[in-house]
Amino acid sequence: MDTKLLEKKMESISPFELKNRLIDMADESLKKTARTMLNAGRGNPNWIATAPREAFFLLGSFGLEECRRIMDLPEGIAGIPEKKGIASHFEAFLKKNNNAPGAKLLEQTYNYLLMQHAADPDSLVHEWAESIVGDQYPVPDRILHFTEILVQDYLSQEMCDNRPPRGAYDLFATEGGTAAMCYIFDSLQENFLLNKGDGIVLMVPAFTPYIEIPQLSRYQFRVTKIHANRMNNEGMHLWQYSDEDIDRLKSPKIKALFVTNPSNPPSYTLSPDTMARIVSIVRNDNPNLMIITDDVYGTFSPHFRSFMAEIPYNTLCVYSFSKYFGATGWRNAVIALHEFNLFDKLIAKLPKEKREILHRRYSTLTLEPEKLKFIDRMVADSRQVALNHTAGLSLPQQMQMGLFAAFALLDKENKYKQKM
């Protein structure tokens, strides 16, 4: 094929598809090398966190024991875990398996929730047993109770540098950051928070789909890109933004800001000056600016502070566990939204005809649809509303997510983080 013609065709496809095409085009002898190098673009780590996985698999043995305690047929059929007395069974299991890989993390996590959050032992262990065997639909559908507690604490530590704002974050557990992105774009549009032709700002470099999705015919947002093109006196790239570009956020025509922080690529955090400037703009010039921040790489940056820590009222945060724990295959992420937030306020202030449309949309879920939080609307929208009763991330995925969070919370010497 003509080289120039090939280049022209390649310009129109996504970088991820381009990577696959380049691998296919490589000579057989070069394919392994090409795949190793090019797959880095997907952000797929070449390590795993072992302790949370050891705890997960050990908990699986306990879960099966509890099921067989209720019923154990030779055909390979067992019962489902019962709540009453299950904590005492778990404590006995830990004592019997105290030297098994994962036992220490399970015991520490159990004690953490009992001591720090006054968890009822039977309720906690019953949630864990059902989660590890995956015998039920997720209830609550947004995120399991004890998973949410662990992940809330984890986000306060990692996204807020242990200085979270007042109030609590509501969390929605999703099938990785990619699902979170889809749910956010869909629900922003379904709830009239972003409409075709609305102005949004993308801070680039960014994860490529954030650039591609707004161009789809369904959305057709008016996109302004601001580029991290600041240089130092020696002409070196700082991967930071000019004040002039940041000031474009002052326009009320800009409805939303999408930011990947740290950037992806090249993994630079926003400078404190830029962060402070955006916070000032939101407070003084454009108070209705919605901020959607993807902070998956924040755990690799010392003392990281997300927009969810600095201006929680305006911020919707996506965090994925995939990169830090070597877990892209687990599809573990959360959407975090403060209990008091701009998104709920904007929905409440919609024109009457739009509020009536939304009332009809969510009327099968509650007698007062107008009071339904935006984050709960996202859960319903993720399953076309009608399937809301079966919404939610699978129980085993949530169990592993909770153990990932607990592992980081209980690593008081930050040995894992320092190795990263």
What are these regions (language model features)?
Residues 2-142, 391:
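N-terminal "arm"/small-domain region of PLP-dependent enzymes with the aminotransferase-like
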Residues 46, 299-300, 307-363:
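Active-site PLP attachment segment
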Residues 51-55, 214-215, 331:
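Short coil/turn segments at secondary-structure boundaries
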Residues 77-287, 298-312, 316:
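Conserved core of the PLP fold type I
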Residues 294-295:
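Walker B catalytic acidic pair
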Residues 354-420:
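Structural motif of enzymes handling amino- and sulfur-group chemistry
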